[in-house]
Design a protein with these regions (language model features):
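N-terminal helical cap/lid subdomain that shapes the substrate entry/recognition surface
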Residues: 2-9, 13-92, 100
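Phosphate- and divalent-cation-binding pockets in alpha/beta enzyme and binding domains
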Residues: 23, 52, 114-117, 171, ...
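Substrate-recognition/cap helix-loop segment adjacent to the acidic, metal-dependent catalytic center
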Residues: 29-31, 52-61, 98-105, 109-139, ...
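Short amphipathic alpha-helix with an adjacent loop that forms part of the alpha/beta core around
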Residues: 210-219
Length: 219
């Protein structure tokens, strides 16, 4: 029986992938004078804020000189232009899911540096029963899903994850959690083949399809 739903952020609750990419590119340019290609930035996704920034600048993620504060300033500066609002119906969906008696979580590759500003801007503060963030050393979503199970006292088949990336599908399969492949973002078409090859349990191309599926799974 479904008891909890955990959401990814970037490309799932908001079309924020371009925001993230451009914030990393602009920060790298301002700090080092080098403008990395979007593909270089995307190739580092999966690890968290400090990991990506360190990779672009040739620095360790735990280097005290890593300009993480500068990155956050750039991220927030670009936010209202590149990703001003969440996907239509996202906030209402979170509230509706909670009203059904389900636990609602957020599991994102972001760290608090960028997760917190986006949650606040999108009016989602207080809507998550659990917030789990990424690590700068490796993609840890499978570990975080296990942590969510322990925190909520739930089995893998009682939790559903909603995420857009091919690696999200891999990590869910690894720990036995069902996944809805969120294929409604601007980057979904580019990743469609990779996502389908990993056999997600469900794949939706419109956010409006999410609630009806959840209702069906609860019946």
């Amino acid at each position: 029986m479904l008891k909890g739903i955990i959401f990814d952020m970037d490309g799932t609750l908001g079309d924020t992938v371009t925001l993230c990419v451009e914030a990393y590119r602009q920060t790298t340019l301002e700090v080092s004078g080098r403008l990395p290609a979007a593909e270089e930035v995307l190739g580092l996704f999966g690890i968290s804020d400090r990991g990506v920034l360190g990779g672009l600048l040739g620095m360790r993620y735990d280097d005290p000189a890593l300009p993480i504060d500068h990155f956050v300033e750039v991220y927030e500066r670009l936010h209202d232009t590149l990703a001003p609002t969440p996907y239509e119906g996202a906030v209402e969906a979170l509230r509706s899911i909670k009203a059904k008696g389900l636990k609602v979580g957020l599991l994102t590759g972001k760290e608090h540096y960028t997760a917190d500003p986006t949650i606040a801007r999108y009016g989602m503060s207080g809507l998550f029963d659990l917030v789990l963030t990424g690590k700068p050393t490796h993609n840890c979503k499978d570990e975080c899903l296990l942590e969510a199970m322990r925190a909520w006292g739930m089995a893998a088949d009682e939790i559903l994850y909603v995420g857009d990336a091919p690696t999200d599908i891999e990590h869910c399969h690894r720990v036995g959690v069902r996944i809805i492949n969120a294929a409604w973002g601007s980057h979904a078409a580019a990743e469609a083949e990779a996502c389908l090859a990993r056999n997600p349990d469900y794949r939706l191309t419109r956010f409006s399809e999410l609630e009806p599926l959840i209702t069906k799974l609860l019946s």
